[in-house]
A protein has these predicted regions:
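Feature captures hydrophobic
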Residues: 2-168
Length: 168
């Protein structure tokens, strides 16, 4: 009988946390027709539900990130404020950071490894993580992956990487 009571406490806190995550990620009107926006909203929601420790980075984020998937001719804006993420279809306002890449490269960022210090640095044994970092670096060197404004907002970029990655 004691187990049932403890279990119900665990269930209720799990439900509260999931409701908190659900309400923290919003699609602005029109963004639900942007497939990449819907996919990124689901990714962040799932990451926060599966790994609650990512919530501290999420809650600390302030500012906006524009993402342009050039091959799909799709753009969106991630607006972080007060523990909430609103995703807009298209570029809204003047973003703090802009990312331009193929849709595959953007989605592949969710596979970046997160090391012990919270940095996207794989261990030498992590072959998949090394491959992702190599692909991103090659695309950047070849001009197929561009990050504008990231150097001026390194904290935001690190938090975004940790929140978006399924690892860590």
């Amino acid at each position: 009988m004691g187990m049932g009571w403890a279990s119900s406490l665990d269930d209720s806190s799990y439900i509260r946390e999931n409701l908190r995550v659900e309400g923290a990620i919003l699609l602005a009107p029109g963004a639900d027709s942007n497939g990449l926006a819907v996919m990124l909203a689901d990714l962040v929601r799932q990451n926060l539900e599966a790994k609650p420790h990512k919530r501290s980075d999420f809650d600390a984020m302030r500012g906006s990130v524009a993402i342009v998937a050039e091959d799909a001719e799709v753009a969106l804006t991630l607006q972080f404020s007060n523990g909430k993420l609103t995703i807009f279809d298209g570029i809204v306002g003047i973003p703090d950071v802009a990312v331009r890449a193929s849709s595959d490269a953007i989605i592949n960022l969710s596979n970046l490894p997160i090391g012990r210090l919270g940095m996207p640095i794989p261990t030498w044994r992590d072959k998949a993580g090394l491959a992702v970092v190599k692909d991103v670096m090659t695309a950047m060197r070849e001009g197929r992956f561009k990050v504008l404004g990231g150097a001026f907002h390194p904290g935001m970029m690190m938090k975004l990487t940790r929140v978006m990655s399924v690892n860590g």
